[in-house]
Swiss-Prot record:
Keywords: Aminopeptidase, Calcium, Cell membrane, Disulfide bond, Glycoprotein, Hydrolase, Membrane, Metal-binding, Metalloprotease, Protease, Signal-anchor, Transmembrane, Transmembrane helix, Zinc
Lineage: Eukaryota, Metazoa, Chordata, Craniata, Vertebrata
Swiss-Prot/TrEMBL cofactor(s): Zn(2+)
Subcellular location: Cell membrane
Organism expressing this protein natively: Gloydius blomhoffii (Mamushi)
UniProt-recorded name of the protein: Aminopeptidase A
Length: 57
C-alpha cells in the first residue's frame, strides 16, 4: 500500500546524490519529478528493492 511518506527524487542528480525521505516503518511510494523513459525503470526497480527491504526488516 502507499502512504503519505514519499521518496523525494531529484532526477537531475546522480544515483549517489539521490536524497530520500523514508519512514522505514511504512511501505513508501515514490514521487517522480520530471520523469523520462531513461529513469522510470530504474525508479521502479529501486522502489521494488526498498519495498522488499522494508518487508524483510
Amino acid at each position: 500500500y502507499l502512504t503519505d511518506h514519499y521518496f523525494k527524487v531529484d532526477l537531475n542528480s546522480t544515483v549517489t546524490q539521490q536524497r530520500f525521505l523514508l519512514d522505514p516503518s511504512e511501505l513508501a511510494g515514490i514521487t517522480i519529478m520530471q520523469p523520462s523513459d531513461s529513469n522510470i525503470e530504474w525508479l521502479k526497480q529501486y522502489r521494488d528493492d526498498v519495498a522488499t527491504w522494508l518487508e524483510n526488516s
